[in-house]
């Protein structure tokens, strides 16, 4: 073999060795971060469960009727951190929801001032979101619900709310893992609160729990706080006027009644309490008594016929219903949640 050929073979071996070393030393590329919502849940039946209720007083069937349970609340503190109300109740509700195949969310609330201060800076939002996501992972939740009541256009919180929701959405939607929802007003009244909800948010939030109730008056009598007309107004404003995707519209239904033309202090009653005072499940008003008023008064609520109509409206013009709150309902044939589920064909 000639010396030239030997040199060529030697060079070939060196080349192969170097090439092999390079392949072994290459660091695989980092997978791209995917920001995308989790799979859609279809028609939502959302029920809030406040921290001050006893989980044992609400039967399992009420959790089977809902496919999402919002625990109320995780609070933003004056220092901008997260504080979850009543951890023992929280963990009991988590267990009860999961045992009955319902998703469990943490609903975030607090004073407007505390939200405003926390959301005012990048650092404040980043710190709060980090605590929220740590709680979501620690308690193995399925998502979060934002219940800031309410950002406004006249103090700059419309912009900081939008920034907060964008950043929280990105954290929840990282690798399509967690849901994010938000509570908004019925949309009836133009102004600094309604207008603070920017259309941009439709891209960040998986659905909106529209609070189509509490349209009361302390001076005008005979005014229903949550009639069917208000539900229609909510649908028309959010989905038609504003262009919210109907797949993201969830209609709120109250399981309680309010008077009109008198004080709301100690006069608001649960649906169950109204029926206990001989109110009818087939009516939307009743004469009741309560400690906040010296004489019997008229209270306005949603009976089963109205709830059925609202459920059908939500099915045709939206994508879900929400109830505040589970404990207010009865747990028998007169149940409002049962009437809604039976109307939309939800099995439980």
Regions found by a protein language model. Give the residues of each.
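Substrate-binding surface in catalytic domains of secreted glycosidases
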Residues: 46, 78-88, 130, 150-280
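Short, well-ordered coil/turn segments that N-cap beta-strands
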Residues: 41-43, 67, 100-104, 140-142, ...
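Glycan-recognition patch characteristic of GH18 chitinases/ENGases
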Residues: 29-136, 223-229
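Bacterial Sec-dependent N-terminal signal peptides
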Residues: 1, 5, 16-42
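Active-site and adjacent substrate-binding regions of carbohydrate-active enzymes
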Residues: 137, 147-174, 178-180, 306-348
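Conserved, mostly hydrophobic/aromatic
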Residues: 69, 106, 146, 208, ...
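Sec-exported extracytoplasmic/periplasmic mature domains
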Residues: 71-74, 98-99, 133-141, 169-174, ...
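Glycan-binding loop/region signatures in secreted carbohydrate-active enzymes
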Residues: 65, 246-317, 338-348
């Amino acid at each position: 073999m000639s010396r030239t050929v030997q040199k060529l073979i030697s060079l070939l071996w060196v080349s192969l060795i170097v090439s092999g070393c390079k392949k072994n030393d290459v660091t695989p590329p980092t997978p791209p971060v995917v920001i995308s919502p989790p799979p859609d849940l279809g028609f939502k039946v959302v029920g809030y469960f406040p921290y001050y209720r006893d989980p044992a007083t609400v039967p399992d069937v009420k959790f089977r009727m809902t496919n999402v349970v919002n625990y109320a609340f995780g609070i933003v503190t004056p220092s901008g951190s997260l504080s979850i109300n009543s951890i023992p109740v929280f963990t009991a509700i988590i267990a009860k929801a999961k045992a009955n195949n319902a998703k469990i969310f943490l609903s975030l609330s607090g004073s407007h001032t505390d939200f405003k201060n926390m959301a005012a800076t990048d650092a404040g939002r980043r710190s709060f979101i980090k605590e929220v996501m740590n709680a979501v992972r620690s308690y193995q939740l399925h998502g979060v619900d934002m219940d800031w009541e309410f950002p406004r256009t006249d103090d700059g919180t419309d912009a900081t709310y939008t920034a907060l929701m964008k950043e929280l959405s990105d954290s929840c939607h990282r690798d399509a893992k967690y849901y994010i929802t938000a509570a908004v007003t019925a949309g009836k009244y133009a102004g600094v609160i309604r207008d603070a909800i920017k259309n941009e948010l439709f891209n960040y939030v998986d659905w909106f729990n529209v609070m189509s109730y509490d349209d009361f008056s302390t001076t005008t009598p005979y005014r229903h706080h949550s009639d069917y007309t208000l539900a229609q107004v909510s649908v028309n404003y959010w989905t038609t006027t504003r262009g919210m995707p109907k797949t993201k519209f969830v209609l709120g239904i109250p399981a309680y009644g309010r008077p009109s033309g008198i004080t709301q202090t100690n006069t608001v009653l649960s649906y169950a309490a109204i029926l206990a005072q001989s109110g009818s499940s087939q009516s939307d008003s009743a004469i009741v008594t309560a400690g906040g008023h010296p004489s019997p008064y008229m209270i306005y609520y949603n009976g089963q016929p109205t709830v059925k109509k609202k459920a059908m409206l939500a099915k045709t013009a939206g994508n879900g219903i929400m109830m505040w709150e589970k404990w207010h309902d009865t747990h028998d044939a007169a149940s409002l949640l049962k009437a809604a589920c039976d109307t939309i064909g939800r099995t439980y």
